[in-house]
Amino acid sequence: MIITIDALLDAAQLNKIQSSLQTAEFIDGRATAGWHAQLVKQNQQLSRTSTLAKSLQEIVQTALQNNALFEAAAYPQRVHSLLFSRYEPGMEYGRHVDNALMGSGDRRDRADLSFTLFLSDPDRYIGGALVIEGACDEQAYRLPAGSLLLYPSSTLHRVDPVEQGYRFACVGWVQSWIRDPAKRELLFDLDTARRSLFTREGKSIEFDLLSKTYANLLRRWSE
């Protein structure tokens, strides 16, 4: 399941991040890639531990926590490993799959879902599409600044070469309460249906039955 969340950031949040990134110091993005992804990763990123990165991470984390669609689609247990990246002309991130586990030592988080928060409007750069491969085809995304794409970490994906301009983005990962993507999609559909029913009919018998089923499936499947 791939979800687009329009305008995750409000104007003030987006402006704060964009203005901060314009003058930020970036490092080689290969530092955080897996050994095989390093071969195809050509971009720059903020150091995760820098004061600026931490302050911008807080803005994004707050926006995610306050977004009902993100909560309903991801069932986030932990949102982790946020990175702010920059692509200059000629840079790309070739075909790869994200690491299943991230972190080191005793603290490792599972990557069930990945997200890309676009921080540059599409008319500010040429190329640089995020391309997600499926079994039979592939889909390319270039969303407005402030919008987010949420997709399974199990997919093969890439960022096409930037031909002109600069592409800024924030990427991150989610360890979900619902590990199985098929179960997660069933819960999302069921929750969407019961909320739609409530909007039309209020707290009906049918709504209560759907809510009972939803709650008990969530109780059974969460981990």
Swiss-Prot record:
Positions that bind 2-oxoglutarate: R167
One GO term of the biological process aspect: DNA damage response
InterPro entries for the chain: Oxoglu/Fe-dep_dioxygenase_dom, PKHD_C, PKHD_hydroxylase, Pro_4_hyd_alph, Pro_4_hyd_alph_FE2OG_OXY
Boundaries of every Fe2OG dioxygenase domain copy: 78-176
Protein residues bound to Fe cation: H96, D98, H157
Details of cofactor binding: Binds 1 Fe(2+) ion per subunit.
Keywords linked to the UniProt accession: Dioxygenase, Iron, Metal-binding, Oxidoreductase, Vitamin C
SMART domains: P4Hc (SM00702)
Molecular-function GO terms, alphabetical: 2-oxoglutarate-dependent dioxygenase activity; iron ion binding; L-ascorbic acid binding
Keyword Iron: yes
PANTHER family according to UniProt: PKHD-TYPE HYDROXYLASE YBIX (PTHR41536:SF1)
Record-linked HAMAP family: Hydroxyl_YbiX
Name assigned to this protein: PKHD-type hydroxylase Synpcc7942_0015
